[in-house]
Amino acid sequence: MNASQQIHVFSSHWKVESVIISLIFSMIFLVGTVGNCLVLAVLIRNGQMNTKSTNLFILNLGLADLCFIVFCVPLQATIYTMDEWVFGAFVCKAVHFIIYLTMYASIFTLAAVSLDRYLAIRYPLRSRETRTPRNALTSISLVWALSLFFSSPYLSYYQQMDLDGTTVCIPAWSVHHRQAMDICTFIFGYLIPVLILGITYARTIRYLWTSVDPMQDMSESRKAKRKVTKMIIIVAVLFCLCWLPHHLVILCMWFGHFPLNHTTYVLRILSHLVAYANSCLNPIVYALVSKHFRKGFKKVFGCAFRNRVVNRIHTVQPAQTVSLMEAASSEGSNHCDGSTRGRLWSKSSKKMMTSAFMTFNVT
């Protein structure tokens, strides 16, 4: 096989891989966007952020994942599917900054919620004064402040450059500075938080499974705490497992034998895909483990479907309108709140008085 044939085969091979990578990134984007939006909708709709600190942490985790999915995943997909960087110097800096900002925010939030769960399980009465929504918001503010501090160097870490007529977005720091930065990211953005997670959840699990309950049957409150703790532990373990290959690849580049060839390039892509996929896994975990979230997802879908049906009703005769409204109201009462039904009836009555035809626009 001559050189031109080899180039053709290699090019065709990478075209196939580019299509596969694009499909995987698209799936991550779709599942992550829909899933995290549903999580935020369930928490905000139920209005439980003001009563439970754990829900605030879950809300913050979903917000960080959603920001990562929306702002980073589409742009990162182009790095592996396009020949050059086309989004400009500012986006080159911003996208990598947001990647590490949301990564730090997620792992710090998981560390904070592990402490919250430990206090809730180990000291259920004494921790009530500490585990307040106000203190949770303070902790979340601290999480984002620390995340901003640790990720801000990445605003200058990457830079748009021209290499042999090709525009690329690559690290601009010297080798020694990049090595020091990557090591610090691994220590503060992975190793220390994972140690905190391991210690707190080990103590929590040991207490849950070894403490003696004076009652024969476990109380409903304790069962609920176990389920929530189980769900958060699964989320934390998935985060650690998904981001581990990313950090290992970077460490191997600095301290191991990691030559730049087709195999190592594929490994780097896979490490990124696994890390990015973590942002769409949490809603799936919530749906599988938590009955509360399953009911919340059904309610959100139910109301969205019924509102969509009502919005499609245009220019209906008055008699038909009344019957349709009664049907929509009676069906929607099981899923939508009373305020929505009230707005529906008030709007309909006003329009029926002024015209023989009606247009519904329930939001």
From Swiss-Prot:
Disulfide bond found in the keyword field: yes
Record CDD domains: 7tmA_Gal2_Gal3_R
Ranges facing Cytoplasmic side: 45-54, 116-135, 201-230, 290-363
Extracellular side: 1-23, 76-94, 157-179, 252-268
MF-aspect GO terms: G protein-coupled peptide receptor activity; galanin receptor activity
Keywords of the record: Disulfide bond, G-protein coupled receptor, Membrane, Receptor, Transducer, Transmembrane, Transmembrane helix
Gene Ontology BP terms: neuropeptide signaling pathway
Localization per record: Membrane
Disulfide-bond pairs as recorded: C92-C169
Pfam families reported in the protein's UniProt record: 7tm_1
Domain of life assignment: Eukaryota
Known tissue expression: Expressed in neurons in the ventral area of the interpeduncular nucleus (IPN) where expression often overlaps with spx1.
Membrane topology label: Multi-pass membrane protein
Function recorded in the entry: Receptor for the hormone galanin. Receptor for the hormones spexin-1 and spexin-2.
Family from the record: Belongs to the G-protein coupled receptor 1 family.
Name of the protein in its database record: Galanin receptor 2a
Gene responsible for this protein: galr2a
